[in-house]
Amino acid sequence: MSAQTSPAEKGLNPGLMCQESYACSGTDEAIFECDECCSLQCLRCEEELHRQERLRNHERIRLKPGHVPYCDLCKGLSGHLPGVRQRAIVRCQTCKINLCLECQKRTHSGGNKRRHPVTVYNVSNLQESLEAEEMDEETKRKKMTEKVVSFLLVDENEEIQVTNEEDFIRKLDCKPDQHLKVASIFGNTGDGKSHTLNHTFFYGREVFKTSPTQESCTVGVWAAYDPVHKVAVIDTEGLLGATVNLSQRTRLLLKVLAISDLVIYRTHADRLHNDLFKFLGDASEAYLKHYTKELKATTARCGLDVPLSTLGPAVIIFHETVHTQLLGSDHPSEVPEKLIQDRFRKLGRFPEAFSSIHYKGTRTYNPPTDFSGLRRALEQLLENNTTRSPRHPGVIFKALKALSDRFSGEIPDDQMAHSSFFPDEYFTCSSLCLSCGVGCKNSMNHGKEGVPHEAKSRCRYSHQYDNRVYTCKACYEGGEEVSVVPKTSASTDSPWMGLAKYAWSGYVIECPNCGVVYRSRQYWFGNQDPVDTVVRTEIVHVWPGTDGFLKDNNNAAQRLLDGMNFMAQSVSELSLGPTKAVTSWLTDQIAPAYWRPNSQILSCNKCATSFKDNDTKHHCRACGEGFCDSCSSKTRPVPERGWGPAPVRVCDNCYEARNVQLAVTEAQVDDEGGTLIARKVGEAVQNTLGAVVTAIDIPLGLVKDAARPAYWVPDHEILHCHNCRKEFSIKLSKHHCRACGQGFCDECSHDRRAVPSRGWDHPVRVCFNCNKKPAWTSLSVMTGKGPLC
């Protein structure tokens, strides 16, 4: 801490002498002040004293011109806060303490202490010094805000415009470990919200855009970082503006309010309107009802080390008038905050979510507006960490991201309530039961967390949706509710044995706890209805996107077809290699001489697509090269190659050059005549067999359609894969997911698992999405007792 005193430092405080006299006689000029030694010290005394081990860590400061120390007796009352501790006016030479005027009167006004010698400090020099320091501090603050710029945080469609935490911190231009608070502003459009923020936080610089035109210059939510107060300042779009998507933009305001520590409501009206109180009251109610729970969930889900207080932000109502008096001016005995609470109570609004509500008014006789009172009130609230403590910018971004993910999406106009600024429709799920029309009571996007739809009332039965669910009666009487479905066979039966039992004794109802509780044809006669004996019926809601409940899960016919297809496919796959080899060899033997052999054709001659083992290679009758089906789908006569006047397959290039005749000699035609005859005979046989196969495929398709389970999408309605959107063709086969019934390609549905809720107790084909879900989701969706399917 010690250093050599420069000649310039000598004479700065000629009236302040060393108060220690430890290494000097007390005649040396004081250079340092030690707050813990409670004395002014010269250079030598400061060095000698603080060489001692117990005094080494004392906090010392170098004196400035006109320095006056703090009162030592005030130190214990208010700590080290400047502006609270009083400056000393004298120093008692006997007690060796500095005293302010009040402490001197209290401790040295009577007794022997009245005679203690004192040294008087020059307070007039102190005042000039403090004013100079204040001016220097103001200049420093203005310089700190010179490079501050605002950025669009959320647009008018509730889309966050920063990609991640790092991008948010980079645009704020603050350190990642910087602790900061959030201050936002609300109010009607045109009341000067952006102008207020510019003058309150940024000394009049236009950080947030302002405009004298009628159009609103603030669209969406903009943010900037105030390095002086260490606060993220957020500017919002005005209320009562001529905008589209009004409901979504109003909901966006509450998201900003939820992440704020301090809220300014700016009003330029001569009298406080009811809209102000309704907005704050409705915002408080919606905050407690919808956002408190989500903020708690965000804390747990994101592992945030700083708790997001369930108590909302502090509110300052900044009221600027021109022609009328400020609130409370005609009632000096009542504070404005008391009058504010009375207005809330009269309107039936109770702003319980806010930690405090303050009123700060200013009357502007002549512009510009005085923002000094608002600035002082803001600084006091920002220093108060009792309710909301500063946090890292990453925590702020996570909270905003969580609220945006949860409360997003369009708000239907027919569901919107106009009696409140923040109706429940802004935050609750918009799904309606298809049977009874009751809405879901959960928050928006609850399906992302696996939470099913729920309603406040019970549903009614609809024959159209058959919204019944069977539960095991024995388990229900034992205190457990277990859903069951009719199906072809029991889970303990093998596929073929299950089909045999189904043919003999009908469908079964199986409970996971009780086993098989019912068979439809267990006896020759006298079989009772399961509802009367082993199951109970429950009527459940029908939510959009969910399948039926007691739809026919008897899949015996489809299981039989699957078994036959499996055997046929196994034989086909085993014989595919030898069959293709023999076919290629036989084709080469009867091919014309100018055709390229199949063994040399590895890819399409035009599009260069590589041929797989089961792909068909086509020869152009004009040039003889190998092509895929799409590059050789055109036909035209090729008489120059001996194919006569009938149209035959040619590639796209030869079709476009059909007017150019190939120069072939008569000798070539004669040489190719024999092979052409053999090839024509081979094609005639192939076409005949193809027609027979097509004739067989038509009734086979009818059989498959008849065997299709009720929840499967019909084949003729499936045009492309439900997952990758590839269009189905001759080469791309359709496959049904046994869980959801949608159509998929083989790549998107190659997983295998049991689907007991659909009657498939053994591993069967399912799509990627259904394979990720728990095994019991299909039924839990119906009853509302599990995650969303």
UniProtKB/Swiss-Prot annotation:
Q: Where are the FYVE-type-classified zinc fingers?
A: 598-659, 715-775
**Which GO BP terms, alphabetically?**
lipid droplet formation
Q: What's a single GO MF annotation on this record?
A: phosphatidylinositol-3,4,5-trisphosphate binding
Which keywords accompany this UniProt record? Endoplasmic reticulum, Golgi apparatus, Lipid droplet, Metal-binding, Mitochondrion, Repeat, Zinc, Zinc-finger
Q: Which domain of life is it from?
A: Eukaryota
* Residue sites binding Zn(2+) 4 per the record: 737, 740, 767, 770
Residues reported to bind Zn(2+) 2: 620, 623, 651, 654
| UniProt KW Mitochondrion keyword | yes
Predominant place of localization = Golgi
User: GO terms for CC?
Assistant: endoplasmic reticulum; endoplasmic reticulum membrane; Golgi apparatus; Golgi stack; lipid droplet; mitochondrion; omegasome; phagophore assembly site
Among PROSITE patterns, the record links this protein to: ZF_FYVE
Q: Where does Zn(2+) 3 bind?
A: 721, 724, 745, 748
Annotated stretches, region: Required for localization in the lipid droplets = 416-788
The record describes the protein's role as: Plays a role in the formation of lipid droplets (LDs) which are storage organelles at the center of lipid and energy homeostasis. Regulates the morphology, size and distribution of LDs. Mediates the formation of endoplasmic reticulum-lipid droplets (ER-LD) contact sites by forming a complex with RAB18 and ZW10. Binds to phosphatidylinositol 3-phosphate (PtdIns3P) through FYVE-type zinc finger.
Assembly mode: Interacts with RAB18 (in GTP-bound form). Interacts with BSCL2 in a RAB18-dependent manner. Interacts with ZW10.
Record's protein name = Zinc finger FYVE domain-containing protein 1
> What's the source species for this entry?
Pongo abelii (Sumatran orangutan)
